[in-house]
UniProtKB/Swiss-Prot annotation:
It comes from Caenorhabditis briggsae. Keywords: Activator, Nucleus, Transcription, Transcription regulation. One of its GO terms (cellular component) is mediator complex. Belongs to the Mediator complex subunit 21 family. This is Mediator of RNA polymerase II transcription subunit 21. Component of the Mediator complex. The gene is mdt-21. The lineage of its organism: Eukaryota, Metazoa, Ecdysozoa, Nematoda, Chromadorea. Gene3D superfamilies: Mediator complex, subunit Med21. One of its GO terms (molecular function) is transcription coregulator activity. Transmembrane segments: none annotated. It is found in: Nucleus.
Length: 130
């Protein structure tokens, strides 16, 4: 995938270079003209056709490379949604387990408090009275 991304970046850089060169060459070699008139000289300009063909070929190569990338956008959303549903189910299960543990610990605390109470009563009753 990284190779394709590098290749895509190289192709985009090449296309930008072609466009920049085309503008520079056409600007330097094109004779002045009016915007509303089409001149025969401009239609016969060989550089225009060469640069147009090069840019079109570069654009087509970029399109072909982009089409070769794996499409995962829709699948990723489905996978994320399924994972969230699974996480919610696990969370509910863990919350239930936690509530059970809290209940058990509350019972154990009560039992320990009762035993401590009994121990203190026994100790108080076993002391000699003064």
């Amino acid at each position: 995938m990284a190779d394709r991304m590098t290749q895509l970046q190289d192709m985009i850089n090449e296309m930008a270079s072609l466009m920049t060169n085309a503008i520079g060459v056409l600007q330097a070699t094109a004779p002045p003209c009016e915007f509303d008139a089409i001149s025969q000289d401009h239609e016969e300009e060989p550089n225009c056709a060469i640069f147009a063909a090069s840019i079109a070929k570069s654009a087509k190569n970029i399109e072909i490379l982009i089409d070769s990338f794996p499409i995962e956008a829709g699948n990723m959303e489905d996978e994320v949604e399924q994972k969230m549903i699974q996480n919610d189910a696990v969370q509910r299960e863990k919350v239930g387990e936690l509530k059970e543990l809290v209940g058990e610990s509350t019972q154990l605390v009560s039992a320990v408090q009762k035993k401590l109470s009994e121990i203190s009563r026994v100790q108080m009753s076993s002391r000699p009275s003064e």
